[in-house]
A protein has these predicted regions:
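Non-catalytic alpha/beta scaffold blocks inside enzyme catalytic domains
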Residues: 1-31, 38, 45, 52-174
C-alpha cells in the first residue's frame, strides 16, 4: 500500500485489514504486505526536517526551539483552525501535491498548479530537482539518498536558492 494514499477517515482500518489478511494467508502460504513509502517527496522532506531539527515532520518552530507534536502540527489542521497567517507551499516536482484550498494567503514555490481551485496569491517558479539542478531524493525504503544530476540548462532557481533569498529579505526587513 502507499501511505500517501491513505488520506481518508479511518485509513488505519485499511492497514489493519491488510495485516489480518497477511496473517490468515500465512497459515497456508507465505505472504507479506509492505508499505510503499511516500511518493510525494514526503520521505525526502521528512529526512531533511529530521537532519535540520532533530525531529521529523510536524514539528513546530514558533518558540525558537523545535517542538514535535504530530497531531498538533498537521498542516491541514493548522490551516483549518486559522492558526496560520500564510501558507508557503513547496512543490518542485510537477504533478505532485498542490496547496489546499484555503482563505490564508498562499505562496507556491513550484510548478503551475494543475488542480482546479483558486490560484495562489504568489507563485515563484522553481527548477525541478534532478532535471534543472542537482539534488537528492530518498529511496522509498528511506535507507539512502539517491543523487540527482542536472539534465538540462535552466534559468529557474532551486527551492533552496529562493528560500535563501526570502530569508535574506526578511532579515533586512527586520
Amino acid at each position: 500500500w502507499s501511505t500517501a494514499e491513505l488520506d481518508f477517515p479511518h485509513a488505519e482500518l485499511t492497514v489493519q485489514a491488510l495485516v489480518e489478511l497477511v496473517r490468515d494467508l500465512n497459515e497456508t502460504t507465505r505472504s507479506a504486505a509492505l508499505p510503499l513509502a511516500g511518493n510525494l517527496g514526503d520521505l525526502t522532506t521528512n529526512q531533511v526536517c529530521t537532519w535540520q531539527t532533530g525531529y521529523p515532520l510536524r514539528t513546530g518552530l514558533a518558540t525558537g526551539q523545535p517542538r514535535y507534536e504530530p497531531m498538533l502540527y498537521r498542516h491541514q489542521d493548522l490551516v483549518a483552525r486559522g492558526e496560520t497567517d500564510l501558507l508557503l507551499w513547496i512543490s518542485a516536482v510537477p504533478g505532485l501535491a498542490m496547496p489546499p484550498e484555503t482563505q490564508v494567503p498562499t505562496i507556491l514555490l513550484g510548478q503551475a498548479p494543475v488542480a482546479a481551485g483558486p490560484p495562489p496569491e504568489v507563485q515563484i517558479p522553481v527548477g525541478i530537482p534532478g532535471i534543472d539542478h542537482p539534488g537528492h531524493w530518498y529511496r522509498s525504503d528511506s535507507v539512502c539518498p539517491l543523487p540527482l544530476g542536472r539534465l538540462r540548462a535552466s534559468s529557474l532557481p532551486s527551492v533552496a536558492e529562493v528560500l535563501g533569498r526570502l530569508d535574506a529579505r526578511l532579515a533586512q526587513a527586520g
